[in-house]
Amino acid sequence: NFDKDEIYKMFNLSPNKKTILFFGGGEFGLGKSRTVEILQTLTQYLDKYQIVAISGKNKKMNQAFKDIADTLEDSNSLKIYEFIDKVPEVMSISSLVVTKPGGLTISESLASSLPILVINPIPGQEEENAEFLESKGIAKWIKKDDNPKEILENIINNQEKLDSMKKNTSLLANKYSTHDICSILLKK
C-alpha cells in the first residue's frame, strides 16, 4: 500500500480531484493524432478530474501534449511527463487509465483494479486484449470511427459505470498471481 497523500504531493496533484492516468503510446507515437484528440477531449473534464499524461520518448507527442496544456486556463490539472518510474503509485490514486492495451500496462491496471479506456491497439494481440477487456466490462475501446466525446461523456460523468468497471476489474485480477506462480514452481 502506498501513502496516497505523499503521491499527491510528489506529483503536485490535488487530493480533491479524481485522477486520470493517460499513456500516450511510446516512442513510435502510433495513432498520434487520435491520441492527441482524446487527450484534448479529456481536458473538458478538468473541473472534476486531473490528468497525468505520459508521452513516452516521442518528442512530437510530448510537444503536442504541452501545446494542449498551453491552451488551458487550469494547466495545473494536466501534468505532462515523458516517463515516470512511479506507475503503480500513480495508479493507486487514479480513477481511470487511458492506454494502448499492451500486456504490462494492462496487467498493472488490473492489479490496481483500474477501469481502462483503450486507445490505438496494434492489430493482433493488442486488439485481442481490447476485445477481451471490453467483453468483461473492464474497458471501453475507443475505436477509430467512434466519437471520443460521446464515449468519454458516458464514462467520465457516470460514477455507476466507473464503479461497475472497477468491480469487474477486481473480479478478473488475481492479486496473488505471483504467489501462485511461485508455489507452482516450488512444487516441481
Segments from the language model and where they lie:
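Donor-nucleotide binding loops and adjacent catalytic segments primarily
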Residues: F2-E6, F11-I93
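A short, well-ordered alpha-helix in the C-terminal region of glycosyltransferases
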Residues: K161-K175
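Hydrophobic/aromatic beta-strand patches that form the interior of the parallel beta-sheet core
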Residues: V52, Y81, L96-V98, L117, ...
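C-terminal alpha-helical cap of glycosyltransferases
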Residues: N174-K188
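A donor-sugar binding/catalytic signature common to diverse glycosyltransferases
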Residues: K86-E128
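C-terminal "capping" alpha-helix adjacent to the active site of nucleotide-linked donor transferases
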Residues: S135-G137, K143-K161
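Acidic, glycine-centered active-site loop in nucleotide-sugar glycosyltransferases
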Residues: S113, E128-A139
